[in-house]
């Protein structure tokens, strides 16, 4: 493939590239929350994920305003922080700083991995109804989000509108966040949601045509029948590449009874008059689609949810309705377990389960009917529900039996030991499966070199001829990923075979295979030459300097100084 370099060599450049399509039998999708880098998530950096186990990684979340202009939730985390170990050598605020850079670097080391941007989420869906309501704002948002992933070199867009037509008031304290936009839904959201997805699909296809690459579009969907009824699945599933059914949080501390929050099947022992949400399960979700749409949708695009985290209750009475599963469908006190995020949701990561069991005196239980794990203390009155390896294996088997598209989990930091992620992988592919790598094609940063002879050698200036075009903060930060010269290395060819040596600001200079090789990246200003910028240095030669003696200058780049070189381009003569 012309100008392609195998990623197994650990080389990468996210300027503009194309990826050959490689078939993998199922999707194994994982969210990564940008706040995972902070102490509240025990500094779970992207490099701590075992990316060899997943096919798609969703960055969560990007926001937008009512006009469809992009809004960063945390610019420092997204684009500026450099203290993550995988960002060694990257300057503050430079391209590939921040979580978005760290995720891109993670992809270098796992060339099969697709990385995407999730927009919205539970607390950032407030402007979706307004944006989706008009052609103008739909198109503006679509252009912006597609431009954003194009600049970053990412692979897909994920729309996480929670939820079309839903009306929910903002509740920052209840959600454990500073900003919760709520969702002012309208009945028209049903149609507008479909139109919004089509607008994004159109822009992705246009970008793909430019870059010779197929970009994916996914959606996160409610598994509640009431919310599912508000989606035109027969139309939506023709637009998107896959739909992630959020078959978790189906029950929780808001209820005055215990129930599974991510069951595969519905255990029918619940009180249908008082426990409405107890009917929800993966199978109930799929049955709804099958009953409503039959063969009018492609079920291989349906991805079902896994929860490596708990929902929990205190004050649980011994009046459970299933004698085979003590504590299930029992009266409980809502919002009674304080979680690490400050809410009363009883939410703890799977990696905290051992500590949780000890703290609350919990024993392991497994509901064979629901194929769901739970943890219960009948004496203390505590009940927690969460996926485990056994329930995940059952979900993987269900995916295969039903011809579905795979599994998705919220979120990586909650499975810090990769136990649930491994179970997901094993259930879909089996132990020992290796994802096939993919090839990338790179395009150049517009660049040139100017040369002047001096008494002992040459004054050389490397010019970045790109221009900054963006004013929106998110796009302005992302634009630098594509348009900057990073960790350059220069190969100077002379007609006379002159030997080159170091001069002012040249960094390391060697002579290899007839070239003078200049690596100035040890100098701060040479690590990143921004659009419109330049970097100047001098080199010495062992003969009389003459411009006519310089045959060519070839430039390569690196994302990190420690990574291999990519994309050789001749920048002199032009």
Language-model features, listed with the residues they occupy:
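Active-site cleft segment of glycoside hydrolase catalytic domains centered on the general acid/base Glu
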Residues: 127-237
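Conserved, mostly hydrophobic/aromatic
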Residues: 57, 117, 159, 200, ...
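Asparagine-centered strand-capping/turn motif at beta-strand->loop junctions
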Residues: 461-479, 492-494
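Glycan-binding loop/region signatures in secreted carbohydrate-active enzymes
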Residues: 67-87, 119, 254, 260-272, ...
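Intrinsically disordered, low-complexity Pro/Gly/Ser/Thr-rich segments with frequent PxxP/GP/PP motifs
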Residues: 502-545
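Short, solvent-exposed loop/turn segments enriched in Ser/Thr/Gly
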Residues: 452-459, 535
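Terminal connector regions
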Residues: 533-574
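Glycan-recognition patch characteristic of GH18 chitinases/ENGases
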Residues: 21-149, 175, 339
């Amino acid at each position: 493939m012309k100008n392609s370099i195998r990623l197994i060599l650990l080389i990468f450049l996210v300027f503009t590239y194309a990826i050959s399509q490689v078939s993998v039998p199922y999707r194994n999708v994982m969210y990564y929350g940008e706040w995972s880098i902070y102490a509240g998530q025990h500094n779970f950096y992207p490099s701590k994920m075992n990316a060899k186990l997943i096919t798609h990684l969703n960055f969560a979340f990007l926001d937008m305003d009512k006009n469809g202009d992009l809004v960063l939730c945390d610019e420092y985390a997204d684009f500026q922080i450099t203290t993550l170990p995988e960002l060694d050598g990257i300057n503050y605020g430079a391209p590939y700083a921040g979580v978005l850079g760290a995720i891109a670097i993670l992809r270098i080391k796992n060339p099969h991995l697709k990385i995407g941007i999730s927009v919205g989420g539970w607390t950032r869906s407030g402007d979706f109804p307004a944006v989706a309501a008009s052609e103008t704002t739909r198109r503006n948002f679509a252009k912006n989000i597609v431009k954003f992933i194009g600049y970053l070199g990412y692979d897909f867009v994920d729309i996480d509108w929670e939820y079309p037509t839903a009306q929910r008031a903002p509740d920052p304290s209840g959600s454990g966040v500073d900003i919760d936009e709520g969702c002012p839904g309208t009945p028209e959201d049903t149609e507008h949601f479909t139109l919004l997805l089509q607008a994004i699909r159109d822009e992705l296809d246009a970008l793909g045509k430019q870059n010779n690459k197929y970009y994916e579009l996914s959606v996160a969907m409610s598994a509640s029948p009431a919310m599912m009824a508000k989606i035109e699945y027969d139309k939506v599933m023709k637009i998107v590449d896959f739909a992630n059914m959020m078959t978790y949080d189906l029950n929780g501390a808001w209820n005055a009874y215990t129930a599974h929050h991510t069951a595969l099947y519905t255990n029918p022992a619940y009180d249908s008059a008082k426990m409405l949400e107890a009917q929800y399960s993966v199978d109930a979700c799929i049955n709804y689609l099958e009953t409503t749409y039959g063969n009018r949708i492609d079920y291989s695009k349906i991805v079902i949810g896994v929860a490596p985290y708990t929902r929990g209750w205190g004050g649980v009475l011994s009046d459970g309705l299933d004698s085979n599963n003590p504590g299930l469908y029992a009266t409980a006190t809502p919002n009674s377990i304080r979680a690490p995020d400050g809410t009363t949701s009883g939410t703890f990561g799977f990696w905290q389960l051992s500590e949780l069991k000890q703290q609350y005196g919990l024993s392991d239980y497994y509901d064979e009917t629901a194929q769901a794990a739970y943890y219960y203390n009948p004496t203390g009155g505590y009940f927690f529900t969460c996926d485990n390896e056994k329930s995940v294996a059952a979900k993987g088997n269900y995916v295969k039996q039903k011809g579905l598209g795979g599994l998705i989990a919220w979120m990586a930091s909650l499975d810090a030991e990769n136990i649930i992620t491994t179970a997901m992988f094993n259930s879909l592919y089996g132990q020992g499966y290796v994802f096939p790598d993919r090839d990338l094609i790179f395009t150049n940063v517009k660049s040139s070199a100017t040369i002047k002879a001096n008494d002992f050698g040459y004054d050389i200036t490397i010019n970045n001829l790109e221009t900054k075009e963006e004013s929106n903060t998110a796009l302005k930060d992302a634009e630098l990923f594509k348009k900057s010269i990073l960790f350059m290395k220069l190969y100077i060819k002379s007609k006379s075979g002159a030997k080159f040596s170091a001069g002012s600001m040249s960094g390391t200079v060697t002579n290899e295979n007839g070239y003078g090789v200049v690596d100035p990246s040890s100098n701060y200003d040479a690590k990143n030459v921004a659009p419109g910028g330049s970097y100047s240095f001098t080199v010495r030669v062992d003969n009389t300097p003459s411009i006519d003696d310089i045959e060519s200058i070839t430039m390569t780049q690196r994302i990190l100084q420690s990574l291999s070189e990519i994309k050789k381009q001749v920048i002199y003569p032009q």
